A protein has these predicted regions:
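Aromatic-Pro/Gly-enriched surface loop or interdomain linker
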Residues: 20-72
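Extracellular ligand-binding/catalytic regions of CAZymes and related secreted enzymes
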Residues: 23-27, 99, 126, 212, ...
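A glycine-rich, often tryptophan-bearing local segment used as a flexible ligand/cofactor-contacting loop or short
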Residues: 84-163
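Catalytic beta-strand/loop cores that center a nucleophilic Ser/Cys/Thr
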Residues: 147-221, 229-236
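Amphipathic alpha-helical scaffolding segments comprising HEAT/armadillo-like alpha-solenoid repeats
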Residues: 278-286, 308-320, 339-350, 373-376
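Short inter-helical turns and helix N-cap capping residues of alpha-solenoid HEAT/ARM repeat scaffolds
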Residues: 291-292, 322-323, 354-355
Length: 376
């Protein structure tokens, strides 16, 4: 009995040492920033890690990896974008450095293109580290939008906040359709299943994405790999799922995030962008350039309601529009979509705002957005 007690204590200490590595016991996360990574995906991934009080985050480049930055990190994230281009930007030697990093007991999370990069997909430049392969790659541009998923029993342990829900919803953007690899004997655990059939674009076939793995997780040497075909980091109320994935890769305990951070009820239905929606979305780009204040506000209303992927790249400058009403609506858009990458811009807009009523409203939006961050 005493021997068993000592064994349990020893295992707990091993588990603690696996994640108490960084300065001040904070886990050090590196987000890859290279050619092929979408800029907004990088921004959003950084913002998601900032939600966790036990983590610090920085970007890393292919040169940083070659220069040994991995020795100063506990986990890395390969963000969305274009996986094969990120492969080319990394280079084979750096990919082997990443493999060795994981094998040594560290963690890796791949998001969408990052998950694609981790697969063993014939005819696609990839790293062969998650036990899956992508199929129907000729229809990768199948569409995007808020999509449904359900958790498996293992997924409910990792995401207990969602355990009682039949379905939850996050942004999906042309992520890989995964099946088990034929060539790599690397078993993975399916943490979630995609429930949405996405085939809005590219002549993609029906019934290809639904009932497929949404999140998969696997051991790799002494470390762990987590692959997400979707974009929780780009989904208001669900960004916290990314640091939770990092926690899984490092065997860290599950901790609760605030109610301001965890808000799965923001989306309770699918919102897939149709071809007509995409045309309308593109038209609003010109609205923001040449439209009246009333037209700009109507555009922001529609883009927020349908969770436009592209609008987040357009709204930043509207904080400094000539119209106070547009400035206020842009501030609300940023706050209500939890867009932390523009927190400093919103703070500046509040500081320079000349209309007192608009300033007060914008300050409320700023405080609402800032409340996502843990108290220091």
């Amino acid at each position: 009995m005493l021997r068993k007690t000592f064994f349990i204590i020893a295992m707990c200490l091993v588990g603690l040492s696996a994640w108490s590595m960084g300065v001040g016991n904070k886990v050090r996360v590196g987000v890859f920033q290279g050619n092929g990574g979408a800029q907004t995906c990088i921004w959003e991934t950084i913002a998601s890690i900032q939600l966790d009080p036990d983590m610090t985050v920085r970007t890393i480049t292919t040169g940083n990896i070659a220069n040994g930055v991995l020795k100063d990190l506990d986990a890395i994230i390969i963000p969305g974008g274009e996986g094969a281009t990120q492969y080319m930007n990394l280079g084979e030697e750096n990919m082997e450095r990443i493999r060795n990093f994981i094998r040594s007991g560290k963690g890796a999370v791949g998001i969408c293109a990052g998950a694609y990069l981790f697969t063993d997909t014939p005819g696609y430049a990839c790293m062969h580290i998650n036990g899956g392969k992508a199929i129907d790659i000729e229809h990768d541009n199948r569409g995007h939008g808020i999509s449904a998923f359900s958790l498996t029993a293992e997924g409910k342990k990792l995401f207990p906040e969602l355990a009682k829900r039949d379905k939850s919803y996050v942004m999906y953007y042309e992520g890989p359709v995964l099946v088990k690899s034929d060539n790599i004997p690397l078993p993975y655990t399916t943490m979630a299943i995609m429930e949405t059939d996405v085939h809005e674009e590219g002549n993609a076939p029906a019934n290809m994405t639904n009932n497929r793995p949404f999140f998969i997780a696997n051991e790799y040497g002494k470390g762990r790999v987590f692959s997400s075909i979707s974009h929780p980091e780009a989904t208001p109320g669900m960004m916290w799922m990314i640091p939770r994935m990092v926690r899984w890769t490092l065997r860290m305990p599950v901790v609760a995030y605030s109610k301001r951070v965890v808000n799965p009820d923001l989306y309770n239905r699918e919102i897939l962008m149709t071809k007509d929606d995409l045309r309308k979305e593109r038209g609003y780009y010109r609205t923001f350039l040449y439209g009246s204040p009333k037209e700009k506000i109507a555009a922001l209303d529609w883009l927020q309601a349908c969770r436009s992927w592209d609008a987040k790249r357009w709204v930043q400058g509207l904080l400094f529009d000539n119209s106070p009403a547009v400035r206020e609506r842009a501030a609300r858009f940023i706050a209500e979509t939890d867009y932390l990458p523009f927190l400093s811009d919103l703070e500046t807009a509040c500081r320079v705002e000349r209309d007192e009523q608009t300033k007060q409203s914008m300050m409320r939006h700023f405080e609402h957005l800032k409340a996502l961050l843990p108290h220091k």
